[in-house]
């Protein structure tokens, strides 16, 4: 797991996004663990305690980061026949670095939008991740 590849922050998802968030948040003890099964190998981001780190899907982990980084989450607007409809897609706004702003593209969940915004605030539009995660 030594080869790294550049990935657009806007395209990060799953374990790749979780690892990038862990690095952006300064969780220096986080590590990428291969899980080998007879049919395939997959990866998890873990704390030294063995806790799986999944800020892009776990509100208990991602929620505090939204507060820490002051990420604004906005549902995608829909104007239906009966007025505004509930949206299943979200985007995030984040301000960083003395007033710079980043707005994500629409994402399937609020946590994914927030996590992408946090990664962008720390690393920019691209981030290096292990090639195995692509």
Question: Where on the chain are the PLM-derived regions?
Answer:
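Glycine-rich anion-binding surface patch
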Residues: 1-134
């Amino acid at each position: 797991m030594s080869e790294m590849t550049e990935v657009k922050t806007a395209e990060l998802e799953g374990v790749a996004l979780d690892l990038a968030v862990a690095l952006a948040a300064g969780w220096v003890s986080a590590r990428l663990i291969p899980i080998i099964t007879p049919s395939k190998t997959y990866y998890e981001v873990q704390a030294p305690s063995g806790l799986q780190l999944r800020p892009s899907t776990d509100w208990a982990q991602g929620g505090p980061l939204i507060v820490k980084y002051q990420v604004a989450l906005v549902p995608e607007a829909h104007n239906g026949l009966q007025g505004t409809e509930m949206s299943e897609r979200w985007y995030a706004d984040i301000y960083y670095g003395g007033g710079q702003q980043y707005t994500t593209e629409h994402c399937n969940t609020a946590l994914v939008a927030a996590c992408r915004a946090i990664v962008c605030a720390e690393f920019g539009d691209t981030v290096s991740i292990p090639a195995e995660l692509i």
